[in-house]
UniProtKB/Swiss-Prot annotation:
Enzyme Commission code(s) on record: 3.2.1.14
Biased composition (Low complexity): 350-381
Stretches assigned to coiled coil: none
Glycan-linked positions: 153, 237, 256
Similarity field: Belongs to the glycosyl hydrolase 18 family. Chitinase class III subfamily.
GO cellular component terms, semicolon-separated: extracellular region
Lineage: Eukaryota, Fungi, Dikarya, Ascomycota, Pezizomycotina
Molecular function GO labels: cellulose binding; chitin binding; endochitinase activity
Catalytic activity: Random endo-hydrolysis of N-acetyl-beta-D-glucosaminide (1->4)-beta-linkages in chitin and chitodextrins
Name the UniProt record assigns to this protein: Endochitinase 2
Species the sequence originates in: Metarhizium robertsii (strain ARSEF 23 / ATCC MYA-3075) (Metarhizium anisopliae (strain ARSEF 23))
Length: 419
């Protein structure tokens, strides 16, 4: 994904699943299966700031079918509770407590009621996560289910209250010798999915395009993924380079991906064409423009592969960059939707309108209790941003005070972190 990622901390172990929180959480279909538009939301940088109201991306004409919440970016390394900052305000601590997550919780319900799937992503391009053992991977997998799935578990923190996500995404961009353990985390999640027959959950991944894939290849070879959001950008200089095959870049290796997964447990996975949502999106700087596909270029690429049985749609990084990239009255997400639905970018009349089919709305509407959203204990300095967390940068509007004893250190125009 985009190179600007935050880092936070970790905590304790997960507990066993209990009675589901609710019997049913139906998600309305927004378009025919096999042609979905997936957008990452929750991280800012590169001079863009996304709308902090997630529900704004779930309007009928938003062009978005799946929203991936980014990221829980610290886990392992001695603790088994994933933590991170999602959006400009929702912080999930190393104890699993949610701080300022009420608005996001309400928006998740709104989006699911509108037919938009909500996926929670782990990882990112930082190096604050790793797995040391199979047991640890299984513990973290169980905790994720208990805290974010329809588990019925009331002994753990639930940052989104009784609402639960529609699946879990793995954007593992750091190997560290631990990739062989993720299969156990995914298997633990899937065993819990099976306990909730009223709902359907997804396991998704966002691998880099090179094959062999350096960080997620082993994971994909040993796990069952439903969606693969392949990042066809930022890999011109890899040993086996790959990209979208445009602008003089490396070749587009979509067919290599269908061949690769054919002999893995993920043989049935849908492959999504992962693209930057603006000329700045892939790197946060103008240098990333080489990886950007203009709407007409994207339409040509999709047109060539959309009939493939593995084709799943388009994935883009990210919501904020899409918002800043408007052509013919359409954001990049709306352009992608038009390409998937109509086979061409938006006309000058603006974005296509989605008309979701009628279906029961999710019943999980309870806001987090005071227990589940209690704030982490304040440090002596009153700061809330943990070690490695983002505390500044052009366009950043989140918290800026670091927990003691860390200080906010500038590392570039777009990024400062607590060190």
């Amino acid at each position: 994904m985009h190179h600007l990622r935050a880092l936070v901390g970790v905590g304790l172990a997960g507990l066993a699943a209990g009675v589901p929180l609710t019997d049913k959480i139906s998600v309305k279909p927004r378009q025919a299966p096999g042609a979905q538009n997936v957008v990452y939301w929750g991280q800012n940088g590169g001079g863009t700031i996304e709308n902090n109201d997630l529900a704004a991306y779930c309007q009928p004409n938003s062009g978005i079918d799946v929203l991936v919440l980014a990221f829980l970016y610290q886990f392992g390394n001695g603790g088994n509770i994933p933590s991170g900052t999602i959006g400009q305000s929702c912080y999930i601590s190393t104890s699993g407590q949610g701080q300022n997550c009420e608005a996001l919780t309400a928006a998740i319900h709104t989006c699911q009621s509108a037919g938009v799937k909500i996926i929670l992503s782990l990882g990112g391009a930082t190096s604050s996560y790793s797995l040391q053992t199979q047991a640890q991977a299984e513990q973290i997998g169980q905790y994720l289910w208990d805290s974010y799935g329809n588990s019925g578990n009331k002994t753990v923190q639930r940052p989104f209250g009784s609402n639960f996500v529609n699946g879990f995404d793995f954007d593992i961009e750091v190997n560290g010798g631990s990739s062989q353990y993720y299969q156990y985390m995914i298997a633990k999640l899937r065993s819990n999915f099976a306990s909730d027959k009223s709902n359907t959950y997804l396991i998704t991944g966002a691998p880099q395009c090179p094959i062999p894939e350096p960080n997620m290849g082993v994971i994909i070879s040993n796990s069952v993924f439903d969606h693969l959001y392949v990042q066809f950008y930022n890999n011109n200089n890899y040993t086996v380079p790959c990209a979208l095959g445009i602008n003089g870049n490396a070749p587009f290796n979509y067919n290599n991906w269908t061949s690769f997964i054919a002999d893995t447990p993920s043989a049935g996975a849908k492959i999504f064409i992962g693209v930057p949502a603006s000329p700045l999106a892939s790197t946060g700087t103008p240098s990333g423009a080489q990886y950007y596909a203009a709407p007409d270029q994207l339409a040509a690429i999709v047109g060539e592969y959309r009939s493939d049985a593995h084709f799943g749609g388009i994935m883009m990084w990210s919501a904020g960059f899409s918002d800043a990239n408007v052509n013919n009255g359409c954001t990049y997400a709306q352009q992608a939707k038009s390409i998937l639905v109509n086979g061409a970018p938006c006309a000058s009349s603006g974005p296509p309108s989605s008309t979701p089919a009628t279906a029961p709305a999710p019943t999980a509407t309870t806001m987090p209790s005071s227990t589940s959203v209690s704030s982490p204990a304040a440090s002596p300095t009153g700061g809330t941003v943990p070690q490695w967390g983002q505390c500044g940068g052009e366009g950043y509007s989140g918290p800026t005070q670091c927990v003691a004893p860390y200080q906010c250190v500038k590392q570039g125009d777009w990024w400062s972190s607590c060190r």
